[in-house]
């Protein structure tokens, strides 16, 4: 469950390392974001000479959460960290690589490009 002022890791090579959520645009009553939801965030930590700079406002989709989510078959899945992938206005990822596993719930939200770039889909 991601809410405002949550610090998240960035799981792509766009250049940002950490971002802070300041608005949940698609989520549970626009209060909490889970896997597959879109948030607006500001870059808190970035690599030098990267595509995004510290202080930039970006859109990101949540790909991993520490809070467990229940699947339709009754199983639960949770991850070790809260992570996002930075996207553009069309919903395509800005980076060309994804680091770490992502949840298969992203397929339901039509983030097929993120699924194809990820090394592991759980």
Curated annotation (Swiss-Prot):
Question: Is Protein biosynthesis one of the keywords?
Answer: no
- The keyword Mitochondrion is annotated on this UniProt entry: no
What UniProt keywords apply to this chain's record, in alphabetical order?
Ribonucleoprotein, Ribosomal protein, RNA-binding, rRNA-binding
Q: Which domain of life is it from?
A: Bacteria
Q: Which Gene Ontology cellular component annotation is one that this UniProt entry carries?
A: cytosolic large ribosomal subunit
Q: What are the recorded GO MF terms, alphabetically?
A: large ribosomal subunit rRNA binding; structural constituent of ribosome
One GO-annotated biological process of the protein: translation
Q: List the disulfide bonds.
A: none
Task: Tell me the Pfam families matching this sequence.
Answer: Ribosomal_L14
Oligomeric state and interaction partners are given as: Part of the 50S ribosomal subunit. Forms a cluster with proteins L3 and L19. In the 70S ribosome, L14 and L19 interact and together make contacts with the 16S rRNA in bridges B5 and B8.
HAMAP family, from UniProt?
Answer: Ribosomal_uL14
In UniProt terms, what function does this protein have?
Binds to 23S rRNA. Forms part of two intersubunit bridges in the 70S ribosome.
| Family per similarity comment | Belongs to the universal ribosomal protein uL14 family.
Q: What name has this protein been given in UniProt? A: Large ribosomal subunit protein uL14
Q: Which organism is it from?
A: Endomicrobium trichonymphae
């Amino acid at each position: 469950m991601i809410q405002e002022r949550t610090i998240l890791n960035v799981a792509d090579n766009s250049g940002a390392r950490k971002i802070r959520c300041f608005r949940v645009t698609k989520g549970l009553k626009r209060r909490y974001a889970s896997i597959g939801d879109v948030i607006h965030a500001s870059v808190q930590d970035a690599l030098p000479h990267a595509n995004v700079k510290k202080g930039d406002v970006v859109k990101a989709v949540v790909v991993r959460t520490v809070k467990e989510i229940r699947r339709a078959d009754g199983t639960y899945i949770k991850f070790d960290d809260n992570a996002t992938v930075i996207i553009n206005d069309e919903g395509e990822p800005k980076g060309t690589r994804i680091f770490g596993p992502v949840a298969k719930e992203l397929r339901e939200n039509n983030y097929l490009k993120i699924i194809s770039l990820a090394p592991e889909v759980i």
